[in-house]
Amino acid sequence: MNIEKFTTKFQEALSERQSLAIGKDNQFIEPVHLLTALLNQQGGSIAPILTASGVNVALLRNELKTELNKLPQVIGNGGDVQLSRQLINLLNLCDKFAQQNQDKFISSELFLFAALEERGTISDILKKCGAKKEQISQAIQHIRGGQNVNDQNAEESRQALEKYTIDLTARAESGKLDPVIGRDEEIRRAIQVLQRRTKNNPVLIGEPGVGKTAIVEGLAQRIVNGEVPEGLKNKRVLSLDMGALIAGAKYRGEFEERLKAVLNELSKEEGRVILFIDEIHTMVGAGKTDGAMDAGNLLKPSLARGELHCVGATTLDEYRQYIEKDAALERRFQKVFVDEPSVEDTIAILRGLKERYEIHHHVDITDPAIVAAATLSHRYISDRQLPDKAIDLIDEAASSIRMEIDSKPEPLDRLERRIIQLKLEQQALQKEEDEASRKRLEMLEKELAEKEREYAELEEVWKSEKATLSGSQHIKQELDTAKTELEQARRAGDLAKMSELQYGRIPDLEKQLEQAETSEGKEMTLLRYRVTDEEIAEVLSKATGIPVSKMMEGEKEKLLRMEDELHKRVIGQEEAVDAVANAIRRSRAGLSDPNRPIGSFLFLGPTGVGKTELCKTLAKFLFDSEDAMVRIDMSEFMEKHSVSRLVGAPPGYVGYEEGGYLTEAVRRRPYSVILLDEVEKAHADVFNILLQVLDDGRLTDGQGRTVDFRNTVVIMTSNLGSDLIQGNKDESYSEMKALVMSVVSQHFRPEFINRIDETVVFHPLGKENIRAIASIQLERLAKRMETRGYELVFTDALLDFIGEVGYDPIYGARPLKRAIQQEIENSLAQQILSGALLPGKVVTIDYANAEVQARQ
C-alpha cells in the first residue's frame, strides 16, 4: 500500500504504532497498536470523535492497554516487525471508504469505521466501550464539516477554532471573567459598529491599562445575559490566540494554512461568531517571509465582505505605527477610542472587583483602601493609566497582608528564637558542676518554662484567629459559587434551581457570613486581615519612593525640628534653611500645590558659603543618603546643542534610545532633590526647558514621554552678585537681597525668575562660622581615623588656630579643608607610617608653641 495516500496525521500514527510494537517486543503490528497510537495522538481527530459519540475513552485506554499486554512477545528478533493480516485488511478497508467518500487521501477517522465494520478484537473493544456506528458516523460528518479530504494536511486544519481561539462567552457563562463595571458608552459604540452590514469591525484604541480587553469581556457577558440587540443574541465571542497560531509552524505556508482554516470555519459559522484579536497590530507582518502573505492581508477580503465580525484592540502608538501605514487594512476597521476612566469611575470599578480579590487573597478590602488606591495612584503614578495602576495597588497590598497571615507573627517568632537560645544555654550549663552554674541553670529553666507557656498561649490564639479567618473565606467562596450557579440557572430558565438558590442557599450563606464577620470583628491580637488605606500608601511608597503613608510621631517631630537637623551641617544661613524647611513641611502636610514641584529655589552667594552643602544635607535628611540628590553641573551645558543632553536626543540623532540625563534620573527616582549647580554658566536655552518644570512640574523628554517633577525639590545655585554680597555684608539682609536681585534680573529672563518659589541670598561666612565648620570637618576626620583604630581628640586651641588659618572672606569655607590637610593630616600621616602613633590609644591633637602637635 502506498504510504503517500495517507494524511500526515495518519502517517504519524503509522510510524508511532511501529515503534510501539518494537518497544513491546511484538513480532506483528496489530490494529490495537494503531488505535492506541491514534488515541494518544496530540491534535488528532480520533479522541474528539470518540468523546462526541459518547464512548468511554478512559475505559477504552485501559482495554487497549490490557490487550497490548496479552500480545505474544518475541525476544531476539532483531527489531524486525511486520504488519499483521488483520491490520492490512483494515487499512485496505480504509482505502475503500476513502474512495467511496471521493477523498484524495485516507484520513485517520476512517480507521474507526473500518474497525467497527470488520469483526475482531478491536471491534469488540470499541463496542464494549459504547461505540455505535451511527453516532460515530455523525461525529465524523460534524468534524469534517461536509468537506472531502483533498489535502494531506486536512486533519490539522480541522477544529481550528477550538485549537487557536479561546471562547470568551463560555468563560463568561462559567463565571470565570471579572465583572465589567461602567464602560457602557464604549460597549454600546462597539455593538453599534458590529451591527453594520459591511465593515462591521470595531477596533478599540487606547493607552495600555485603560481596559480595552475588559470591554470585549463585558460584551461577552452581555451576550450571555441576553442584554444585547437582536442581531447579536446567541453569538459567540472567540479570542484569537496568536501564540498558538504561530507556534510550531515550521514550514513555509503552514501559518497561512492555519489562519485560512480559522477563516474558513468562521465563514461556515455565517456570522454567529465575533472574533476578538487582542494586540491586533501583531497581525500586520505576522508570518511574513519572502513572497509570503502576512496575516493582515489574509484578513482583508473577509473583513471587507462583512463575513468576519472582528473586534480588535491595540494602543495608540502601535495603531499609528502598524495599522495606519496599511491604509487598506485601516479602512476596514472603525475606530472606537477608549479613554482613561476618571478617579470616580475607577473607584466604582474597584468596588465591583473587590469581591474577586478578597476571595483570591482571603483578606478584607476596606472602602478607604479602594478610594486611596484610585486617588493616590492617579496623583503619584504618572506614567501609567487608571484603572490598571489602581488595581495593581489593591492586588499588591492584599498580597502583602496575605503573606503576613501565612507567615508566623513577629511576637511568636521572637519567642521561638528566645526559646531556642535558652535551650542551647541549658545544654551547655548541664555539663557544668559548680554552684554558680547550677543556680544559673535553675533560673534558666524557670525562664524557659515561662517562655514555653507564653509561646503555647500565643500559638493557640494565632491558630484560632487563622481558623476564624479561613472559615469566613470558605463561606465567601461558597457564596460566590452559588451566585454564579444562580446566573446559570436564570439563563437556562431552571426555575426550581433558581428558587432553591435565591430563597434558600444564598440567604443562608449570607447569614453565616454575617455571623463569621461578627466574630472576626472582635479585635484580633496577632493577625491583620484588613487592607486599609495605610497598606495602599505603604505599597505606593515602596514602588515610587514617595512618602505618602501617614506620618509616625517620630517623623512629625523630625519635620518640626528640621531646621536644627540642617544646622548641624550648614552653619549660619538662617534664611536659606528656613525657606527649604518650610517647603518640605508644606509638602508632607499636603498643603503644597499638587501640580508644581515641592519647592524651587535659587541660591545666590559667594563661593564656599554652603549652597551645595545645604542640598546634600537636605537629601540626607529626606532620604538618609546624599546619593538621592540628582546633581547636574550646569557648566557642562554652555553650548546651545548641549540642551538635548538634559531631555534626550531627538529622533534620528545618536543617543536617541538612551534618554536624557535629567529626565531619566527623575523617572527612576521621582522623589528626589535636583541640584542645578552654577546655573548662570548654562546657555540661555536651558532656562526655556526649566520653565515648564518650575511651573507645571512636568517635562517631555526626547521620546515624547512626560516626566513628572511634582515630587522633586529643584535647587539652583549661582555666584551672581557675589561681589555685591562681599562689599555690602554689613548692610541689612533685605537691602543686600535687593542689590543682588538687580544683577540677577539682568542675567535671567523675568519669566524664569517669576517661576522660582524663593530666591535666597547666602551671607559671607564670619570667623565664628568658620570655627564651627572646622569643628564639623575635624569630627569627620576623627570618624575616618576611628575605622583605622585611632581615637582623635582635638583641643580648643587647635580649633581656634584652624579657624584662623582657614578663614578667607572671599573664598568661604573651602580654604578650611586645605588648612586641615596641610596643618593636621600631613603630619598625622607621617607619624602613623613611622610608627610614632599606635592604634588603640587616644591621640590628642593640640596647637602649642606655634605648631600642631599630636601625642599619645
From Swiss-Prot:
Keywords: ATP-binding, Chaperone, Coiled coil, Cytoplasm, Nucleotide-binding, Repeat, Stress response. GO terms for molecular function: ATP binding; ATP hydrolysis activity. The keyword Lyase does not apply. It comes from the Bacteria. Residues 391-523 form a coiled coil. It is found in: Cytoplasm. Residues 555-764 are annotated as: NBD2. Residues 83-146 are annotated as: Repeat 2. GO terms for biological process: cellular response to heat; protein refolding. Residues 765-856 are annotated as: C-terminal. Residues 341-545 are annotated as: Linker. Pfam families: AAA (PF00004), AAA_2 (PF07724), AAA_lid_9 (PF17871), Clp_N (PF02861), ClpB_D2-small (PF10431). InterPro entries: AAA+_ATPase, ATPase_AAA_core, Chaperonin_ClpB, Clp_ATPase_C, Clp_N_dom_sf, Clp_R_dom, ClpA/B, ClpA/B_CS1. Residues 159-340 are annotated as: NBD1. ATP 1 binds at residues 206-213. Residues 6-71 are annotated as: Repeat 1. The Clp repeat (R) domain probably functions as a substrate-discriminating domain, recruiting aggregated proteins to the ClpB hexamer and/or stabilizing bound proteins. The NBD2 domain is responsible for oligomerization, whereas the NBD1 domain stabilizes the hexamer probably in an ATP-dependent manner. The movement of the coiled-coil domain is essential for ClpB ability to rescue proteins from an aggregated state, probably by pulling apart large aggregated proteins, which are bound between the coiled-coils motifs of adjacent ClpB subunits in the functional hexamer. Part of a stress-induced multi-chaperone system, it is involved in the recovery of the cell from heat-induced damage, in cooperation with DnaK, DnaJ and GrpE. Acts before DnaK, in the processing of protein aggregates. Protein binding stimulates the ATPase activity; ATP hydrolysis unfolds the denatured protein aggregates, which probably helps expose new hydrophobic binding sites on the surface of ClpB-bound aggregates, contributing to the solubilization and refolding of denatured protein aggregates by DnaK. Homohexamer. The oligomerization is ATP-dependent. Belongs to the ClpA/ClpB family. This is Chaperone protein ClpB. It comes from Haemophilus influenzae (strain ATCC 51907 / DSM 11121 / KW20 / Rd). The gene is clpB.
